[in-house]
């Protein structure tokens, strides 16, 4: 999900404050390149590429509405001014998953935050989908989580099947308070969504306690997807779990939500995650 405050702050820092008086129709590609190269030369080549892409979108929007006539920025590529983010491939092993779950249970973090972190592990959701989740989004009797379009990355509502483990965790969380938001600030006593930084901070603390190769909350999502494949779950079902659009013609003609299949897949994954190491074969390297 796009964090608009972050985008606004980034554009304000690198574009509005230093270049806000410039007139777009007077700017050629060399002038644009100088702006982004300054960001890259300041030690942020990846951010230079991000700012370039954001500004391309801004200028295209202005072009469509005939507010500007010149679009020289479109001539630039990310590699002309900086570089693209490195593609992460981190997948946690089953031993690491077991260790992580154990660390969560033994941690001093509030129980509501423990549940938050466990649900990220067991559902493969985006953190923003969970931190902004409301009671009305869940039908726990049917093991279904409906993520509204406002919270999904592609802005389309989708249904996610839940395992029995996830349902039990959600019931526990909802029984802890009467607020509409499922995950609220522990000490606030207010019906507001928990801050988006909470899972990131918790993940960083847990990672430090674990040691070994670094990981992020998004790596837990990738781990879910990888293990679903390894467990024999059909690709289209695994993609539905993550809230991804199906590829190609399937996106047009296949509008089935595969909830029953998702629930079966997530129960299979939960069983794999919960089964003691000495009773299972590791299915991923």
Where are these regions (language model features)?
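Short, polar N-cap/turn motifs at the start of nucleic acid-interacting alpha helices
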Residues: 137-144, 212-214, 233-253, 276-285
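C-terminal secondary-structure termini that scaffold catalytic or DNA-interacting sites
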Residues: 164, 168-179, 184-193, 248, ...
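Active-site/catalytic core of tyrosine-dependent DNA strand-transfer enzymes
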Residues: 91-98, 142, 151, 161-213, ...
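Basic, Lys/Arg- and aromatic-enriched nucleic-acid-binding interface segment
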Residues: 41-54, 64-127, 131-132, 141, ...
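Short basic/aromatic active-site micro-motif
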Residues: 27, 112-114, 213-231
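Basic/aromatic-enriched alpha-helical hairpins
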Residues: 1-42, 58-61
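Catalytic-site neighborhood detector that most strongly recognizes the C-terminal catalytic loop/helix
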Residues: 83, 91, 147-155, 189, ...
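Short, amphipathic alpha-helical segments that act as regulatory/interfacial helices
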Residues: 8-12, 52-63, 117-124, 229, ...
């Amino acid at each position: 999900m796009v964090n608009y405050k972050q985008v606004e702050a980034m554009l304000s820092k690198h574009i509005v404050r230093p270049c806000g008086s410039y007139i777009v129709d007077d700017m050629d590609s060399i002038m644009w390149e100088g702006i982004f190269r300054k960001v890259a030369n300041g030690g942020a080549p990846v951010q230079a590429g991000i700012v370039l892409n954001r500004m391309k979108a801004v200028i295209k929007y202005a072009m469509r509405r005939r507010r500007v006539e010149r679009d020289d920025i479109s001539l630039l590529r990310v590699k002309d001014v900086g570089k693209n983010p490195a593609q992460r491939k981190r997948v946690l092993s089953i031993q690491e998953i077991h260790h992580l779950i154990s660390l969560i249970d033994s941690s001093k973090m509030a129980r509501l935050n423990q549940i938050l972190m466990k649900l990220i592990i067991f559902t493969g959701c985006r953190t923003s989908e969970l931190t902004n989740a409301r009671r009305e989004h869940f039908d726990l009797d049917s093991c279904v989580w409906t993520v509204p379009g406002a919270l999904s990355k592609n802005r389309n509502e989708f249904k996610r099947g839940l395992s029995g483990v996830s349902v039990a965790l959600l019931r526990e969380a909802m029984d802890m308070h009467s607020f509409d938001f499922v995950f609220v600030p522990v000490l606030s006593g207010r019906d507001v969504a928990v801050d988006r930084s909470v899972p990131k901070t918790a993940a960083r603390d847990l990672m430090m306690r674990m040691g070994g190769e670094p990981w992020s909350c998004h790596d837990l999502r990738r781990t879910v997807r990888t293990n679903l494949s390894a467990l024999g779950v059909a690709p289209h079902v695994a993609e539905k779990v993550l809230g991804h659009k199906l590829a190609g013609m399937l996106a047009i003609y296949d509008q089935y939500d595969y909830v029953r299949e998702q629930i079966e897949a997530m129960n299979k994954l939960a069983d794999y995650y919960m089964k003691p190491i000495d009773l299972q074969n590791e299915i991923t390297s």
